[in-house]
């Protein structure tokens, strides 16, 4: 009985503690600092000195005709750097501005209550100004500035960048429906946000939004097929079906022109967008959940949208399908889980239900430190907050070294880091980009969730209910590419430079920062333990709902790749590779992996805790050096989202270089060679030279007893 009484007292204390923390939380201060993070990521000629340690940067960024702005700087010099790097990726930047615009529209009164209206609108405008500048002609848009591989191979503040920064354009011949529609969405949302305070600017935003919508809708194509440099960082995993709907919804909201809504309704049905939302995150790649939510409000007479949104939200609630950490974070994937939970929390706040509001409250509480470890995931705020996020400017190395100085020189206050592992484990380690990268899209959903909690009893702005014609007034010019129901989200945003330290993600030199920002089902992720200084920024790993393609054979071996991925393993690589190469195939196989080592890229095949090294003692694979051989590569084992052991392939081959035009079997012991035990998440094979090497081929990757 005494034990029972103590348990009851502990439960009551826990509930009271939560209530007190909620009551005492200054959401206005959190919101202000979350917005100030964007000032820390500004590029171009800065209009103020609000962040004294940031200066002018990327002043020569321009469209291919070297156009200048009013200050004589490149016309694309402004905008936001994506994450902890110096690249301007058009898709996540536009997505971030759409999300900020959306939260402003929904929670304008809460924002005003905090006295943050001016800061909020300034934050949006700094991004939308760049989107307008990037829209250089009716059917032309600058989708990216900066070479991700080159940028990620250097570690230092953006003010010191000297590398070439190419601009990648989208045109009618090189279309990019995702970016065109996302930029249209951002500018349409901005036109609503600025309508009362700056009607002239609002009109400019809307004019560009209409033209961009027409560009994306008429000239269809996957943007990362046109801007191939983006594939290792922000590949379009979901295709553009969701973007067609998303863009049309926002144009309808801004114009009340029913033609846009008719398109949205038709494309939602034909593209299977409701299905794309289920079991997934709302993020820069997949806007399907947001489409369900907005259409449920715009077309309340059609139950499909409400049903689809409720299905999505229920998945995120306890017991609904998404993994929950022991401390209570809704954890959908290992790359930057905090960002997904924060964005889901924002959408939950708009559900108009008690369970949605409760979900929002609990997720934000966890992120700001109300969790068993009393660990905040917001830099500079809450208990035990991070101080070493993966961010070049805040770290401020002058020696191209991710480890020097030991601690970041400047506090990136208000930035949401990637977040914990599935068991709430977390280490404040700059080189661990999976847990410690920050990015504009990470904060975008977080800002919205915070704005909702300033006054949780406030309701979002109601939307007009239109009359919808079920048949589109314009038939799509092309059937959008197919989208998986599960979409990876991102790939690295950065690549290490050269001096490795430990778990680089992309280009060694130091320790990588983060190769993808997320780990896609197909590209991104992490980087070596040795050279890289950083890896890509956003590789997203897809929601783990894949059906295994092969069952391991009675404990003797576990196939990872055999003419294709096996047993739930996914492609989280960053770098130039193919999983379906047929030009150099081992006898008895139909495909091999081709990999062109350069810029510290890697082939990363992962599956969370799928290899139990107590059962499978070794990792084996066959490798062919192709036309030249002698490639300098390293194999790294990943556990709990971190590299835990690494060996040069040459060393595993008895000191013999990789042989040209011949298949060689490589075998390594998890315990003896990598000093690792327990369950691990996979392996990556990475370039350690930096310069481009000849293509290598890999086959038959298995874990053996």
UniProtKB/Swiss-Prot annotation:
A GO CC annotation given for this chain: extracellular region
Tell me, which GO biological process terms does this entry list?
A: cellulose catabolic process; spore germination; sporulation resulting in formation of a cellular spore
Q: Might you give the EC number(s) for this enzyme?
A: 3.2.1.4
What function is annotated for this protein?
Answer: May digest the spore cell wall during germination, to release the enclosed amoeba.
UniProt similarity note? Belongs to the glycosyl hydrolase 9 (cellulase E) family.
Species of provenance: Dictyostelium discoideum
Superkingdom field: Eukaryota
Kindly identify the residues recorded as the active site.
Answer: 85 (nucleophile), 390, 428, 437
PROSITE patterns referenced in this protein's UniProt entry, alphabetically: GH9_1, GH9_2, GH9_3
The record's keywords, sorted A to Z, are: Carbohydrate metabolism, Cellulose degradation, Glycoprotein, Glycosidase, Hydrolase, Polysaccharide degradation, Repeat, Signal, Sporulation
Q: What reaction does this catalyse?
A: Endohydrolysis of (1->4)-beta-D-glucosidic linkages in cellulose, lichenin and cereal beta-D-glucans
Biased composition, Low complexity: where in the chain? 462-552
List the GO molecular function terms.
cellulase activity; cellulose binding
Residue segments, region Disordered: 455-556
Q: Which residues form the signal peptide?
A: 1-23
Record protein name field: Endoglucanase
Please give the residue ranges the record annotates as the region Pro/Thr repeats ('hinge') (Pro/Thr box).
463-552
Glycosites: 75
């Amino acid at each position: 009985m005494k034990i029972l009484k103590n348990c009851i007292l502990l439960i009551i204390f826990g509930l009271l503690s939560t209530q007190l923390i909620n009551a005492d939380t200054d959401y206005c201060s959190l919101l202000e600092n979350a917005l100030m993070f964007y000032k820390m990521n500004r590029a171009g000629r800065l209009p103020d000195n609000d962040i004294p340690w940031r200066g002018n940067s990327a002043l020569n960024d321009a469209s291919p005709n070297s156009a200048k702005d009013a200050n004589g700087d490149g016309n694309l010099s402004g905008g936001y750097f994506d994450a902890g790097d110096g690249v301007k990726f058009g898709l996540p930047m536009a997505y971030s501005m759409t999300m900020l615009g959306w939260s402003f529209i929904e929670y304008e009164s809460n924002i005003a209550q905090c006295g943050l209206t001016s800061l909020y609108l300034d934050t949006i405008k700094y991004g939308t100004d760049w989107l307008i500048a990037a829209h250089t002609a009716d059917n032309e848009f600058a989708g990216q500035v900066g070479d991700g591989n080159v940028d990620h191979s250097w570690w230092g503040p953006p003010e010191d960048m000297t590398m070439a920064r190419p601009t990648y354009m989208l045109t009618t011949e090189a279309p990019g429906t995702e970016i065109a529609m996302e930029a249209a969405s951002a500018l349409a949302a901005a036109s609503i946000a600025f309508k009362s305070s700056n009607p002239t600017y609002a009109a400019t935003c809307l004019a560009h939004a209409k033209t961009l919508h027409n560009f994306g809708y008429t000239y269809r194509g996957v943007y990362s097929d046109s801007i191939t440099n983006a594939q290792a960082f922000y590949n379009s995993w979901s295709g553009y079906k969701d973007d067609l709907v998303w863009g049309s919804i926002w144009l309808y909201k801004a114009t009340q022109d029913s033609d846009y809504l008719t398109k949205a309704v038709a494309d939602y049905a034909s593209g299977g967008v409701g299905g794309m939302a289920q079991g997934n995150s709302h993020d820069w790649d997949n806007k399907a959940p947001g489409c369900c939510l907005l259409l449920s409000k715009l077309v309340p007479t059609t139950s499909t949208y409400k049903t689809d949104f409720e299905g999505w939200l229920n998945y995120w609630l306890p017991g609904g399908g998404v993994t929950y950490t022991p401390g209570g974070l809704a954890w959908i994937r290992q790359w930057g889980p905090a960002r997904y939970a924060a964005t889901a929390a924002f959408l939950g706040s708009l559900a108009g239900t008690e369970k949605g509001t409760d979900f929002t409250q609990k997720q934000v509480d966890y992120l700001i430190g109300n969790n068993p470890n009393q660990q905040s995931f917001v830099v500079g705020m809450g208990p035990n907050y991070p101080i070493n996020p993966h961010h070049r400017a805040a770290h401020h190395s002058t020696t191209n070294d991710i480890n020097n100085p030991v601690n970041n020189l400047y506090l990136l206050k208000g930035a949401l880091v990637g977040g914990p592992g599935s068991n709430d484990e977390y280490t404040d380690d700059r080189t661990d980009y999976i847990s410690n990268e920050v990015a504009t899209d990470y904060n975008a959903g977080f800002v919205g969730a915070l704005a909702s909690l300033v006054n949780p009893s406030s309701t979002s702005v109601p939307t007009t209910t239109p009359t919808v014609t079920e048949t589109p007034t314009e038939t799509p010019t092309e059937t959008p590419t197919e989208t998986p129901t599960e979409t990876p989200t991102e790939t690295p945003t950065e690549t290490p430079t050269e001096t490795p330290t430990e778990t680089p993600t992309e280009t060694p030199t130091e320790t990588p920062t983060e190769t993808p920002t997320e780990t896609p089902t197909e590209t991104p992720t992490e980087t070596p333990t040795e050279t890289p200084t950083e890896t890509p920024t956003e590789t997203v790993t897809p929601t783990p709902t894949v059906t295994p393609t092969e069952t391991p054979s009675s404990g003797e071996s576990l196939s990872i790749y055999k003419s294709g991925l096996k047993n739930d393993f996914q492609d989280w690589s960053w770098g130039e590779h193919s999983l379906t190469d047929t030009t150099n195939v081992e006898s008895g196989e139909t495909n091999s992996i081709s990999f062109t080592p350069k810029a510290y890229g890697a082939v990363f095949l992962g599956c969370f805790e799928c290899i139990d090294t107590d059962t499978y003692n070794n990792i084996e694979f066959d490798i062919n050096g192709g036309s030249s051989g002698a490639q300098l590569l390293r194999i790294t084992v990943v556990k709990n989202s971190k590299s835990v052991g690494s060996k040069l392939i040459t060393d595993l081959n008895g000191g013999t270089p990789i042989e040209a035009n011949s298949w060689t079997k490589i075998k390594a012991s998890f315990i003896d060679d990598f000093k690792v035990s327990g369950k691990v998440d996979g392996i990556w094979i990475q370039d350690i030279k930096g310069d481009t090497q000849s293509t290598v081929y890999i086959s038959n990757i298995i874990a053996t007893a």
